[in-house]
Amino acid sequence: MYKRLVQEFFPKLDFENLEKYVNLIEFSNKNFNLTAFSGDILWKEGIFESIFTMNFIVGLVNNKENKKLKILDIGAGSGFPSIPFLITNPEIELTISESMQKRCQFLKDISEKLDLKFNLICKPVQEINPQKFDIITARAVANLEKLEKITKKIHFPKTLLAFIKGPKVFNEVQNCKNCNYKIIKVNNNINKKIFIAFKQVS
């Protein structure tokens, strides 16, 4: 069902490569326990949600010059949300920070087998050198207070911090003093409450 929904919503994507990516996750999951998603749920909450929400996040960026966007995905694990989005938008400049070695190795394999070009940093985000990213994002990594701390040294003015969250985001905002995140609900077709906590660094 959701595999078909992905095809319908994103007809211009490289669907063959996307299927290969899903198959690699399913195969590697047997040995590495990369994600709890499998089957139709993988297409729903892994693939569709990633592409849909990343499209939404990119829409929050003031990109009148239509420049190549530099995106950092923190703790992508098996590649969500950035890899499905990269497959559909190969023109972006993607960097992934992933500290778990087994997941990092999987991402290296993905890059080689699917011929995807992205920068992979196999260490915690706190240890990477500051770069001028347009967007810093993460999904299911940490609460807002922790994300605020670990990204503090790596962003620049005008960087958009945009984190994919569930309904508990409102509690996280209350607990993150002086963080000043805005919350927006992402209307979607998978009957799931998805929110983006975002702000532009001043």
UniProtKB/Swiss-Prot annotation:
Keywords: Cytoplasm, Methyltransferase, rRNA processing, S-adenosyl-L-methionine, Transferase. It is an enzyme of class 2 (transferase). Its EC number is 2.1.1.-. GO terms for molecular function: rRNA (guanine-N7-)-methyltransferase activity. SUPFAM superfamilies: S-adenosyl-L-methionine-dependent methyltransferases. InterPro entries: rRNA_ssu_MeTfrase_G, SAM-dependent_MTases_sf. It comes from the Bacteria. It is found in: Cytoplasm. One of its GO terms (cellular component) is cytosol. Pfam families: GidB (PF02527). S-adenosyl-L-methionine binds at G75, F80, V125, Q126, R139. The keyword Hydrolase does not apply. Signal peptide: none annotated. Belongs to the methyltransferase superfamily. RNA methyltransferase RsmG family. HAMAP family: 16SrRNA_methyltr_G. Specifically methylates the N7 position of a guanine in 16S rRNA. This is Ribosomal RNA small subunit methyltransferase G. It comes from Mesomycoplasma hyopneumoniae (strain 232). The lineage of its organism: Bacteria, Bacillati, Mycoplasmatota, Mycoplasmoidales, Metamycoplasmataceae. The gene is rsmG.
